[in-house]
Amino acid sequence: MAELEFKRPYTEVTAMVIGVQPIGEYDRRVVLLTRERGKISAFAKGARRPNSQLVAATDLFVFGTFRLYAGRDSYTLVEASVQNYFPWFRMHIEASLEGQYFCEVLEYCTRENNDEAQLLLLLYQTLRALESGKFPARLVRSIFELKTVVIEGEMREPNPQKYLPAVMAALHHIERAPIAKLYSFSLDEPAQKELAELARRCMEFAFERHTFRSLEILEVMEV
């Protein structure tokens, strides 16, 4: 009698790596922000070995399709088809820190099995905007922060009398524009500073003054 063949319950997700942690001598634990299942963690066995097929696929910012084995209590990464490595960030320290901050924010505020597709798209478009060099990094950060707060449903409308008209116009654009058209405006220096302050206040309210380590490093570098 032929033996029955049992197929493992594989799952495929479109995702970006937003967190990486070494495990033991050769393995990695990755945090994936997925289109289908929200934020999930997966173990990548042997991913730190030089000849592993998972070495490059488990770096921060990697975007693509990930094939996972769903175990009883966790996922195991089996293979990945990478669509974008975002290699530019590995050559620019400050930009890399900005990207790490974006990932840290989303790792903090997203949940497993939530619909986080909009935040995944926001992260992808934000990295592309920063990579393009068309926008000041601080403006990109402010836009990302405000749109994240909007998507999370935590936006409180500011008093328009306290801000420049250009800042209020920018805020209304951020609130209403589809993510694909989010990064399509510029501001002069005074307006950028006001927008940054508004974004800071909104983030503090939305996330209860949570400390983001990568942001602390960025702020030290900006002094």
Regions found by a protein language model. Give the residues of each.
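Non-catalytic alpha-helical scaffolds and adjoining flexible linkers that form interface surfaces
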Residues: 1-28, 33-223
